[in-house]
Amino acid sequence: MFYRRKFYIVRNEFVEEFNKHFNKTNLPNQLSHGSRLVGRWMTAHDEHTTEFFAIWEYDSYEDYVEIENKIVADTVHVNKIKAWYEAHGGREYVLSNYILQVKNEKLIDTVTPTT
């Protein structure tokens, strides 16, 4: 199995919009291409921001790469993402003013021995 963690720091005034976008746009698209969501959580980061993270599961790293390639090739989805950014001032504006940090990280299993 391959697991990844998607991590964000988001300004509090954008939390509702960010959650709506995930549930309405990103989650259905990820699932339709074969991603499996283990869970998604949020917690206060400081008085102005909220931390989000999601854990995703794949059968292998190769499956993850294949699924991600399908997602970025999905022009309908890509256009929805572009339109969402534009509705909020453009991608650069959103990433400078609302979504302050993004990480996409491989997780390493510490319970099951690797062979």
Where are these regions (language model features)?
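Short, structured motif recognition centered on aromatic/hydrophobic residues
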Residues: 2-7, 18, 30, 51-56
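Surface-exposed interaction/gating patches
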Residues: 1-17, 36, 106-115
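Short, solvent-exposed loop/turn elements at beta->coil junctions and helix N-caps
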Residues: 41-44
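Short acidic/glycine-enriched loop/turn segments that link adjacent beta-strands
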Residues: 46-50
